[in-house]
């Protein structure tokens, strides 16, 4: 697709990746990031948060698996120190815990432009009412996928949900599609740029249907490089609307300073 000159971009925090996607993630859109364990999914999200906070944007990290302490330690080891942004209010971390907790969240007074199914989901999850959004821990057992909206303040500009796949378990394919579509549309209506990290197990379990809901998709792999015989990390960008992209696989590494892209390798690996 031809790139749009009017599409604003949000830098990814990974310089060479920005060059591959027209300057960054499309602003106000949802991007799906999938991959098996060990491919660096969380690190991609940390790069985005560090860059966006450095640019003065209000950011939210919704963590469904790792603790804030572990995430902050991981970011610090890569030179992406996030603590100052927590202190000055540019970053907030919402941890979704498997504990009992009180009702949480915030208002989302938007129904214009949504279909009946989406409006039903919004009302079912009480997104049309006002709630607190300052609670630290949340009950993943009773939390709905669309409840993610409730955790995001009105002034947020960039959100990373890591791992949205955790919230997909227990849903059938139609339920997941309806809820994920609604979540993505509500956040896009608020002009929030979102990266949805999704583990490969949940991605396959939901028949890869999340690809159809988001504006873009980045897939991470660990495969044997036939030229070197070594197991290496690759990424592909099969979809990025309003952006001119290459379908070649891109070799990358995780270094002491985070993600480093090493160049395109064409279609040299079998990702099946």
Regions found by a protein language model. Give the residues of each.
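Phosphate-binding/switch loop-helix module in NTP-utilizing enzymes
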Residues: 99-188
């Amino acid at each position: 697709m031809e790139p749009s000159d009017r599409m604003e971009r949000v830098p990814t925090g990974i310089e060479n990746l920005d060059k591959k996607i027209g300057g960054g993630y499309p602003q106000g859109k949802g991007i799906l990031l999938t991959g098996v364990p060990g491919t660096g999914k969380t690190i991609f999200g940390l790069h985005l948060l560090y860059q966006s906070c450095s640019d003065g944007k209000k950011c939210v990290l919704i963590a469904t698996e790792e603790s804030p302490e572990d995430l902050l330690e991981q970011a610090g080891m890569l030179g992406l120190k996030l603590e100052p942004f927590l202190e000055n209010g540019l970053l907030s971390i919402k941890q979704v815990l498997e504990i009992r907790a009180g009702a949480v969240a915030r208002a989302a007074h938007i129904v214009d432009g949504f279909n009946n199914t989406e409006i039903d989901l919004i009302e079912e999850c009480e997104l049309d009412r006002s709630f607190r959004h300052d609670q630290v821990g949340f009950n993943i057992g009773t939390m709905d996928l669309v409840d993610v909206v409730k955790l995001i303040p009105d002034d947020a500009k960039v959100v990373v949900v890591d791992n949205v796949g955790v919230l997909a378990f227990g849903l059938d394919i139609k339920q997941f599609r309806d809820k994920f579509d609604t979540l993505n549309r509500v956040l896009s209506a608020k002009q929030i740029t979102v990266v949805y990290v999704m583990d490969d197990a949940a991605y396959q379990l939901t028949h890869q249907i999340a690809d159809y809901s988001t504006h873009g998709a980045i897939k991470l792999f660990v495969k044997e490089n036939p030229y070197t015989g070594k197991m290496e990390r690759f990424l592909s960008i099969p979809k990025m609307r309003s952006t001119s992209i290459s379908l070649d696989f891109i070799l990358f590494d995780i270094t002491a300073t985070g993600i480093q892209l090493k160049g395109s390798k064409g279609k040299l690996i079998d990702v099946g």
